[in-house]
Amino acid sequence: MVSSVPKLHALFVSKSQPVLRAAKVTNEERSTKSKLARSLARAVNSNPWSDELESSLSSLHPSQTISRTTVLQTLRLIKVPADGLRFFDWVSNKGFSHKEQSFFLMLEFLGRARNLNVARNFLFSIERRSNGCVKLQDRYFNSLIRSYGNAGLFQESVKLFQTMKQMGISPSVLTFNSLLSILLKRGRTGMAHDLFDEMRRTYGVTPDSYTFNTLINGFCKNSMVDEAFRIFKDMELYHCNPDVVTYNTIIDGLCRAGKVKIAHNVLSGMLKKATDVHPNVVSYTTLVRGYCMKQEIDEAVLVFHDMLSRGLKPNAVTYNTLIKGLSEAHRYDEIKDILIGGNDAFTTFAPDACTFNILIKAHCDAGHLDAAMKVFQEMLNMKLHPDSASYSVLIRTLCMRNEFDRAETLFNELFEKEVLLGKDECKPLAAAYNPMFEYLCANGKTKQAEKVFRQLMKRGVQDPPSYKTLITGHCREGKFKPAYELLVLMLRREFVPDLETYELLIDGLLKIGEALLAHDTLQRMLRSSYLPVATTFHSVLAELAKRKFANESFCLVTLMLEKRIRQNIDLSTQVVRLLFSSAQKEKAFLIVRLLYDNGYLVKMEELLGYLCENRKLLDAHTLVLFCLEKSQMVDIDTCNTVIEGLCKHKRHSEAFSLYNELVELGNHQQLSCHVVLRNALEAAGKWEELQFVSKRMATLRESDDCSVLE
């Protein structure tokens, strides 16, 4: 409805109108443009694109053309890329001439939203959309190359780069920097080498500081620190001076490679150079961490004091890094000195949660649980909030010492305070809570364990073993529905339960009469590439039939036949009967035919008896004919009942067809329905059929007379 869209006034004027003279934009004009952009975006965001929406958009701002600023602001405010593109085309159709900036903005919008195919098509339509006024240039390709890289599609980035060159568009240093970063993040160091050579030798593009920082960081992250160091040394050849980021990157790479002495020399070289580049807190902290990783704590302490002597103020990361190294070396007295020294007028370091976590872990690792608990209590005394790491270390240690009561107290506190849902940077580890999950699930407290587990899931933490522990716990406690819900969650996260978990859950669901859930679990089991034993199929089918779930029973029988699962004649008969009783005779006959085609039988007498009792005589007629087709014996009394019933309901043709079939097979002699059939045919005026029956009756009388004479 037009009325549902915010009323807008005439947005565009004729192209024939004179162009307004450029004037200084006032704050009031800016406010008007922003307000108009918000109104346009609000209309687009809150309504599906339609002729009504376009009509309403066209009714804004009479006698004034829309400004370039308004178009750009509107594009930035539109939420859905497809709507943004429609708006882009719509203003163009109304006479607005897009320039380079709006094309670039639209391309960035599509790329950020991962609409990459649309973005690619848009890129190659720029010249057409602008009537040749806007030419393809490297910045457009750079945008889409970055978008492909952010989506993890590095090969598409490379292909687009090749296309760019084939079209005669020279890559810029920004193009090469983007592609180098993408390749190195994917570990394609060889391709990055080749690209760097192509950059210099083929295109003559001079690397800048960002290029070298990208290469050095990429090679360091790919454990190629020697190559990174060589690139670092080559910077002077290109008159490109390393900045502090460059130095810090190479120092970090060397430290991670265990070459801490060389990293120290690099830092010392920074100090000796008469440049504006000096080591900062990151430089020293990285070196401290490097020495701590090699357990050269004395050297780490010396670097720390050297940092202080040069007037650099350590930050929390510096202190925590050194404290971690000292605690792992069990040099606790020196930690006190560091903390005391960190409270002078210069440094003013206040221990944070990370500091206490380091100390707690160190004490736990050393087997000093009481000391760890004291540190934890001191943390609370200082009004600091323990995070997931604080609790997980203590809970795991208590479980290892079989002190489950104390562990459970902390576990409950963890849940009640919603520690796992906190915004701390420390991502919880599910494995740390597994011992507690196992204990609770083994002691009838699975619900308590699941509460914490669901908090972990909300933080994006996944752990397949925990799912099994909880599902098993619920099953052990007879709570099969919660177990089923966890299994569904597990599969949604693309984790596959094991065979034992599936079988345990199906068995439990059947025990409480949850046939549909058991059937669903069985189907999920099959989709997980497991094939249950025949008894599992039979158990589920029996419960479905018992609960009168006709459609599900039908589906399961057909599935069993498809999977070549052995059939049970009693169950098959029960399912066919259920389908007949549910007015689904087509499915009933289909099942019967499929069973017989696969070499299985049903209890025909039972089915025919049911159909006759319930006056489903046409179905009984069809079923008897099927039996005769398959050469299966049918009780003659049943045939009499079917024929007489059909006659009674004036289904003379069906009654005669069955009689005729019995005659052809020589099975009519024992029939007692001749008179009933003859009378019905006579009343219906079916003389030809009447004559046929009469002849058979005469033949039978003659045969009987001969038998008497003999």
From Swiss-Prot:
It is found in: Plastid, Chloroplast. GO terms for cellular component: chloroplast. PPR repeats lie at residues 137-171, 172-202, 208-242, 243-277, 280-314, 315-351, 352-386, 387-421, 429-459, 463-497, 498-532, 533-567. Pfam families: PPR, PPR_2. Residues 1-21 form a transit peptide. The keyword Chloroplast applies. Coiled coil: none annotated. It comes from the Eukaryota. Keywords: Chloroplast, Plastid, Repeat, Transit peptide. Its main location: plastid. InterPro entries: Pentatricopeptide_rpt, TPR-like_helical_dom_sf. PROSITE patterns: PPR. Belongs to the PPR family. P subfamily. PANTHER family: ATPASE EXPRESSION PROTEIN 3 (PTHR47932), EXPRESSED PROTEIN (PTHR47932:SF62). This is Pentatricopeptide repeat-containing protein At1g02060, chloroplastic. It comes from Arabidopsis thaliana (Mouse-ear cress).
